[in-house]
């Protein structure tokens, strides 16, 4: 048996090929799985459970079917931090704290989306602190659907423009932040996404940091079992 980790699918109505690839994954890759963990940014944008698009509602039904066979866990990302209990319940997902510790086949492991580790990106960390406030989230939820969508579109546009000007280092995790989280959680393995740079990093003190990749051009899945870890790519099946 094995436990699977994915993240950064950025599903949207504009990229239904990714949704189709994810659906195939759910149909074919979970027979021997103990659990599925989704480490944030399942959706490209999420402005509230009350305006979920049809493709997202169909996906919720699919995830609900999966959850009847194995547990499905979700950690918020920076694109879908407004995903709430209503959609999670419809999808059969259990929402976890943004930093969660697990014992994976005898190895103490911490999992998270990963944006909190990019501490050199000061502007983003200020925004992240603001949107984590309960009051800010509540006020945002009180806005009209049109206004929320407009704000989300503006944030996405500004983020894309800003990221094009940021250095590779600023947009990656900061080593001191990684070390601090290992020390705080007393873990040996760390699993996260967000950076879109899939890799297995071997660190000091027998620690490992595993980064799951995005799903823009191909799928990325981390499989963890008692035998070890396997970070693999899943090519998309292009149909005509």
Swiss-Prot record:
HAMAP family: LpxH. Hydrolyzes the pyrophosphate bond of UDP-2,3-diacylglucosamine to yield 2,3-diacylglucosamine 1-phosphate (lipid X) and UMP by catalyzing the attack of water at the alpha-P atom. Involved in the biosynthesis of lipid A, a phosphorylated glycolipid that anchors the lipopolysaccharide to the outer membrane of the cell. Mn(2+) 2 binds at residues 41, 78, 113, 194. Substrate binds at residues 78-79, 121, 159, 163, 166, 194. Pathway: Glycolipid biosynthesis; lipid IV(A) biosynthesis; lipid IV(A) from (3R)-3-hydroxytetradecanoyl-[acyl-carrier-protein] and UDP-N-acetyl-alpha-D-glucosamine: step 4/6. The keyword Cell wall biogenesis/degradation does not apply. Belongs to the LpxH family. The keyword Cell inner membrane applies. Mn(2+) 1 binds at residues 8, 10, 41, 196. Keywords: Cell inner membrane, Cell membrane, Hydrolase, Lipid A biosynthesis, Lipid biosynthesis, Lipid metabolism, Manganese, Membrane, Metal-binding. InterPro entries: Calcineurin-like_PHP_ApaH, LpxH-like, Metallo-depent_PP-like, UDP-diacylglucosamine_Hdrlase. The gene is lpxH. It comes from the Bacteria. Pfam families: Metallophos. It is found in: Cell inner membrane. GO terms for cellular component: cytoplasm; extrinsic component of plasma membrane. This is UDP-2,3-diacylglucosamine hydrolase. It is a peripheral membrane protein. One of its GO terms (biological process) is lipid A biosynthetic process.
């Amino acid at each position: 048996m094995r436990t699977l980790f994915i993240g950064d699918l950025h599903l949207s109505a504009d990229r239904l090929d990714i949704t189709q690839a994810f659906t195939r994954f759910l149909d074919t890759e979970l027979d021997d799985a103990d659990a599925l963990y989704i480490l944030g940014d399942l959706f490209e944008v999420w402005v509230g459970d009350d305006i979920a698009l049809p493709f997202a509602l169909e996906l919720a039904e699919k995830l609900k079917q999966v959850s009847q066979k194995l547990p499905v866990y979700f950690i918020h990302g920076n694109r879908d931090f407004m995903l709430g209990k209503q959609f999670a319940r419809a999808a059969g997902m259990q929402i976890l704290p943004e930093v969660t510790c697990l014992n994976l086949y005898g190895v103490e492991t911490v999992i998270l989306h990963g944006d909190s580790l990019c501490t050199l990106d000061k502007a983003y960390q200020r925004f992240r602190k603001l949107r984590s406030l309960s009051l800010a989230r509540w006020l945002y939820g009180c806005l009209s659907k049109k206004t929320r969508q407009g704000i989300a579109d503006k944030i996405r546009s500004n983020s894309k423009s800003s990221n094009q000007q940021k250095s590779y280092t600023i947009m990656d995790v900061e080593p001191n932040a990684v070390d601090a989280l290992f020390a705080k959680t007393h873990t040996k393995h760390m699993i996260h996404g967000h950076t879109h740079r899939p890799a297995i990093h071997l660190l000091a003190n027998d620690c490992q940091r595993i980064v799951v990749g995005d799903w823009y051009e191909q799928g990325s899945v981390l499989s963890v079992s008692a035998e070890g870890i396997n970070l693999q790519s899943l090519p998309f099946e292009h149909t005509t």
